[in-house]
């Protein structure tokens, strides 16, 4: 076990799927988890899940405003306490790059679910330049695990592949995501972004089929972007239809992290209803 550089940690968003996993991972590693009002060595900002139900542009905008306000407040807290801030974002900030590979240096053209995160990252980097904020960024692939998007999709017989399904998705199992966040807290370089995804981007069709096969359910059909957007909301539909082949080389090399579930096929069972 590493000597803990940042022992006292506040995890913002610890009640969600990802935040719970991050809190569990840090506690198991020996960190002391504290409330926001206590003196801390580090703050981890886990994003709140998108609101349930149909995700309209208006609902997403309201959610994004809340997340941006929380990120700004946590950054101020970190500056006052001279604490490290780990901002957990999403690979959707890079958007659709077709069949080309994406790494941290790839230009961002955010998908709808990543637009707010790109704005927050710019603000936090400005605070680093102007006031010395010790901030590290972890951008996660599509996170799956118990109680998450995959489980909800499996329980909904109306779930469909958006479009023809040939776009790439880069995913990460929730416990692997939590381990990446913990590694970034301990070993990440300030001002640096780490993309944390599994080892094999799969097409949306392959991901959907792997989930259905693991659950013993029929493989889903397809729906046009228009039909999918009308049912689940266009921001979500457009994001799921974006093609993202994301590399994890920097996280492996600099953080010493590697996914225990290298593909969705290996880990999808963890998202099945129990």
Residue ranges and their predicted role:
Residues 17, 21, 180-235:
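Mid/C-terminal beta-alpha module of Rossmann-like enzyme folds, strongest
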Residues 3-29:
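N-terminal Rossmann NAD(P)H-binding glycine-rich loop of SDR-like oxidoreductase domains
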Residues 90, 121-146:
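Conserved beta-loop-beta element that borders a ligand/cofactor-binding pocket
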Residues 116, 143, 148-153, 162-185, ...:
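Substrate-positioning beta->alpha
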Residues 205-209, 229-258:
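Conserved C-terminal active-site "lid" loop/helix of NAD(P)H-dependent oxidoreductases
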Residues 262-274:
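Amphipathic terminal alpha-helices
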Residues 71-112:
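Conserved Rossmann-fold NAD(P)-dependent oxidoreductase catalytic core, especially the SDR/UDP-sugar
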Residues 34-73, 77:
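NAD(P)H-binding glycine-rich loop region in Rossmannoid oxidoreductase-like domains
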């Amino acid at each position: 076990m590493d000597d803990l550089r940042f022992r006292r940690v506040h995890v913002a968003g610890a009640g969600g799927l990802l935040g719970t996993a991050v809190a569990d991972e840090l506690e198991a590693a020996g960190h002391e988890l504290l409330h926001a009002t206590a003196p801390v060595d580090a703050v981890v900002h886990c994003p709140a899940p998108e609101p349930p139900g149909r995700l309209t542009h208006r609902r997403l905008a309201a959610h994004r405003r809340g997340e941006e306000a929380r990120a700004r407040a946590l950054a101020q807290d970190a500056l006052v306490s001279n604490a490290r801030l780990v901002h957990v974002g999403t690979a959707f900030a890079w958007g659709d790059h077709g069949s080309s590979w994406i790494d941290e240096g790839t230009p961002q053209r955010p998908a709808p679910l990543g637009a707010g995160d790109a704005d927050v990252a710019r603000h936090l980097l400005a605070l680093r330049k102007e006031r010395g904020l010790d901030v590290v960024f972890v951008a996660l692939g599509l996170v799956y695990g118990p109680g998450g998007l995959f489980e909800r999709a499996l329980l909904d017989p109306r779930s469909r592949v958006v479009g023809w399904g040939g776009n790439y998705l880069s995913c990460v199992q929730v416990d692997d995501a939590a381990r990446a966040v913990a590694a970034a807290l301990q070993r990440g370089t300030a001002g640096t972004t780490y993309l944390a995804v599994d080892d094999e981007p799969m097409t949306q069709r392959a991901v959907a089929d792997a989930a259905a096969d693991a659950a013993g359910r029929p493989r889903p059909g397809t729906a046009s972007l228009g039909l999918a957007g009308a049912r689940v909301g266009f921001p979500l539909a457009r994001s799921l239809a974006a093609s993202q082949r994301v590399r994890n080389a920097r996280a492996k090399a600099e953080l010493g992290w590697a996914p225990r579930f290298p593909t969705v096929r290996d880990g999808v069972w963890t998202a099945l209803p129990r």
